[in-house]
From Swiss-Prot:
<dbReference type="GO" id="GO:0009317">
    <property type="term" value="C:acetyl-CoA carboxylase complex"/>
</dbReference>
<feature type="region of interest" description="Acetyl-coenzyme A carboxylase carboxyl transferase subunit alpha">
    <location>
        <begin position="276"/>
        <end position="589"/>
    </location>
</feature>
<comment type="function">
    <text>Component of the acetyl coenzyme A carboxylase (ACC) complex. Biotin carboxylase (BC) catalyzes the carboxylation of biotin on its carrier protein (BCCP) and then the CO(2) group is transferred by the transcarboxylase to acetyl-CoA to form malonyl-CoA.</text>
</comment>
<protein>
    <recommendedName>
        <fullName>Acetyl-coenzyme A carboxylase carboxyl transferase subunits beta/alpha</fullName>
        <ecNumber>2.1.3.15</ecNumber>
    </recommendedName>
</protein>
<dbReference type="InterPro" id="IPR001095">
    <property type="entry name" value="Acetyl_CoA_COase_a_su"/>
</dbReference>
<comment type="similarity">
    <text>In the N-terminal section; belongs to the AccD/PCCB family.</text>
</comment>
<keyword id="KW-0862">Zinc</keyword>
<keyword id="KW-0547">Nucleotide-binding</keyword>
<feature type="zinc finger region" description="C4-type">
    <location>
        <begin position="50"/>
        <end position="72"/>
    </location>
</feature>
<feature type="domain" description="CoA carboxyltransferase N-terminal">
    <location>
        <begin position="46"/>
        <end position="312"/>
    </location>
</feature>
<dbReference type="GO" id="GO:0006633">
    <property type="term" value="P:fatty acid biosynthetic process"/>
</dbReference>
<keyword id="KW-0444">Lipid biosynthesis</keyword>
<comment type="pathway">
    <text>Lipid metabolism; malonyl-CoA biosynthesis; malonyl-CoA from acetyl-CoA: step 1/1.</text>
</comment>
<keyword id="KW-0067">ATP-binding</keyword>
<feature type="region of interest" description="Carboxyltransferase">
    <location>
        <begin position="46"/>
        <end position="569"/>
    </location>
</feature>
<keyword id="KW-0276">Fatty acid metabolism</keyword>
<dbReference type="InterPro" id="IPR011762">
    <property type="entry name" value="COA_CT_N"/>
</dbReference>
Length: 589
């Protein structure tokens, strides 16, 4: 599978060099001071006890590890100022809304005294610090909830700061990143606290409708009214490992309905599996990950903003591949059916890994589950951000079982649609790689609305206002394949197939004899050349003797060169013309 970062960005390299130099100078100075210092009890290293493993650990070393226990990998909660320092460029943070003060809307007894004591103890005026900063040079609004302040609960001031931040970010055309760490609503402010959920959500909505990026980072714990409002409304949702994330906390569930919760319930990994989180990110990778996300969402015009360094790239096949292609015998129809089904055939992720500079996988349908049969996320095509979605059958038996042999569930189609709508919002072209025997026909899929999910994709894809390119790279099985193939252009690999259903199913339905599958394949017109004649596909991708590892570079280069030509062509069209082109493409049938 592709790695998140294939090559280091120059902004990251420069920032890390400065940080290393500063650390080296500090270490050298510490060494000189150590030579003359008298060892006293006060000089003894400060230690803390890890609440998970129970071991006594050096506080200075824990700090070096981004406040992660070096014995058991436990994530300590991080103060707002430290969190800001960990992800911001040096001296880049500019605080906003520091003048807001906490009131007592319900005249709750001793609330003002509790606030005053908490302010004195923490040095914070309220439970969130928010402002503008830079991350490797990328400007963004950054907010951090500090759990030391009344468990990071959301009262009027926290809600007001978040709402005002979204409003100002909308005015200044800035993305928003919020680190969430909260027990939920602030009980002492009652119904006024509850209203913050609606207020912050409405502000997030306006920010989104302005076409701007919002990234919440869910840390331990994120619960209650914070989870049920702004924390779960991001374009891309990140989480730290093992973070508790849920609406009703474990104690509330157990005390209210008496249900004992299983191990790992409501943790970040649980939320990823159930489709509510895009990525779980190690703390040491957070700054780089946030930068990569911000960079991918820089405002752009057109769809062919390629790096000039690649303008002279040669996408022609090697002489060896040309020779191999010339020697290859043409496949008969059934040979193509068999070839398309081979487990060793190049998969979506192989092409994605070869063609794109970087790939950042995003997960989840935001409703029920993440479907491993569909892999999707943000990639770069020679510097041009694109949304890439592929059906992945798997590379071995274990992987195939995990990915349900490339038969997507409703959750997979909904994940794909979520990513496509996200691409539309941020003006990213969409490229899909299709290789499926069909949508999963199981009972659970029917219970979760398989037909509706496919129909919804067909409906929505017809109106998405960015270019869509679809590549049929193996099996194209019925509506399950079509649900990812409503594009401005559809390309098909030389030995791929695309059909109303499998030849076996066709023979069984029409002739009541599944053994006549080979005969059925001949009459169904399922090959690339048949479908090119029928105008179902626009281009045939050569396989240079077979879609195997040896041919990957030649096939990948062919795809890449023609993808760039496609995007250059589509960049000349208005959004209305894009939609009309796609509508006419399918209207002609």
């Amino acid at each position: 599978m592709m790695k998140l970062f294939k090559k280091k960005d120059k902004n990251i390299e420069a920032e890390e060099t400065l940080a290393k130099n500063a650390e080296s100078e500090k270490t050298a100075a510490d060494g000189k001071n150590a030579g003359v210092a008298q060892e006293t009890k006060e000089d003894a290293p400060e230690t803390i006890v890890c609440p998970k493993c129970g071991k006594t650990v050096l506080k200075s070393v824990v700090k070096q590890h981004k406040y992660v226990c070096y014995e058991c990998n436990y994530y300590f909660r991080v103060r707002a100022k430290n969190r800001i320092r960990m992800v911001s460029d040096k001296e880049a943070f500019e605080p906003w809304f520091t003048e807001l003060t906490t009131g007592n809307p319900l005249n709750f007894p001793e609330y003002e005294e509790k606030i005053a004591k908490t302010q004195e103890k923490t040095g914070l005026s309220e439970g969130i610090v928010i402002g503008k900063t830079k991350i490797y040079g990328e400007e963004t609004v950054l907010g951090v909830i500090d759990s030391r302040f009344m468990m990071g609960s959301m009262g009027h001031v926290v809600g007001e700061k978040i709402t005002s931040a979204f409003e100002r970010a909308t005015e200044e055309r800035l993305p928003v990143i919020l680190f969430c760490c909260s027990g939920g609503a602030r009980m002492q402010e009652g119904i006024i606290s509850l209203m913050q959920m609606a207020k912050t959500s409405a502000a997030a909505k306006r920010h989104s409708e302005a076409g701007l990026l919002y990234v919440p980072v869910l840390t331990d714990p994120t619960t209650g009214g914070v989870t049920a409002s702004f924390a779960m409304l991001g374009d891309i949702i990140l989480a730290e490992p093992k973070a508790l994330i849920g609406f009703a906390g474990p104690r509330v569930i157990e005390q209210t309905i008496g249900q004992k919760l299983p191990e790992g319930f409501q943790r970040a990994e649980f939320q990823l599996e159930h489709g509510f989180v895009d990525m779980i990110v190690e703390r040491e990778d957070l700054k780089k990950t946030l930068y990569k996300i911000l960079r991918a969402h820089r405002p752009t015009t057109g769809y062919a903003n390629f790096d000039p360094l690649h303008s002279d790239d040669n996408y022609e096949p090697t002489e060896l591949m040309k020779e191999r292609e010339a020697k290859a015998k043409p496949f008969k129809v059934w040979d193509k059916v068999s070839a398309a089904r081979q487990i060793k055939r190049l998969a979506s992720v192989d092409y994605m890994d070869y063609i794109f500079d970087e790939f950042m996988e995003l997960h989840g349908d935001r409703y029920f589950r993440d479907d491993p049969a569909i892999v999707g996320g943000i990639a770069y095509l020679d510097g041009q951000p694109v949304t890439v979605i592929g059906v992945h059958k798997g590379k071995d038996l274990e992987d195939c079982a995990k990915r349900n042999y490339g038969m997507p569930s409703p959750e997979g189609y909904r994940k794909a649609l979520r990513l496509m709508k996200q691409a539309e919002k941020f003006n990213r072209p969409i490229i899909t790689f299709v290789n499926t025997s069909g949508a999963y026909p199981g009972m659970e899929a029917e219970e979760n609305g398989q037909g509706e999910a496919i129909a919804r994709n067909l409906y929505e894809m017809s109106g998405i206002k960015v270019p869509i390119l679809c590549l049929m790279i193996g099996e194209g099985g019925s509506g399950g394949a079509l649900a990812l193939s409503v594009g401005n252009e559809v390309w098909m690999m030389e030995n791929a197939t695309y059909s109303i259903l499998s030849p076996e199913g066709f023979a069984s339905i029409l002739w009541k004899d599944g053994k006549r599958a080979k005969e059925a394949a001949e009459v169904m017109k399922i090959t690339a050349h048949d479908l090119k004649e029928l105008d179902v596909v626009d281009d045939i991708i050569p396989e240079f003797g077979g879609a195997d590892e040896d041919a990957l570079s030649s096939i990948g280069n062919y795809m890449k060169g023609n993808m760039k030509k496609f995007l250059e062509k589509e960049s000349k069209l208005t959004k209305d013309q894009l939609l009309e082109e796609r509508y006419k493409r399918f209207r002609k049938f």
